[in-house]
Swiss-Prot record:
Classification of source organism: Bacteria, Pseudomonadati, Pseudomonadota, Gammaproteobacteria, Candidatus Pseudothioglobaceae
A GO molecular-function annotation: rRNA binding
Protein name: Large ribosomal subunit protein bL20
Residue runs in coiled coils: none
Native source species: Ruthia magnifica subsp. Calyptogena magnifica
GO biological process per UniProt: ribosomal large subunit assembly; translation
Amino acid sequence: MARVSRGVQAHAKHKKILKKAKGYYGARSKVYRVAKQAVIKAGQYAYRDRRQRRRKFRRLWIVRINAEARNNGLSYSRMIDGISKADIEIDRKVLSDIAIFDKTAFAKIADQAKQALVV
């Protein structure tokens, strides 16, 4: 059996990793071994942070809703409870946008939530 040189494949593989590591500092963008580790770690961070981004946005929306709900005489939990009892189907993302950009509409939603809590 003939010996196989992997020159072309190895060069392509190295080139692919070094391309992904472009912009990294020092050896992380120059040396294949180090660059490969850096690219793998970057992938792990990216995977983790895509999930954390969703959590962070939800927390932000809740903070915004709570702030505006308190301006309308409700706490966040009472507001959400009232909205669900009033059969208003609106998610936190949209509700936080309304709280920021359309305070009168948010006040109307808050009033409906208050009425649903009383009944």
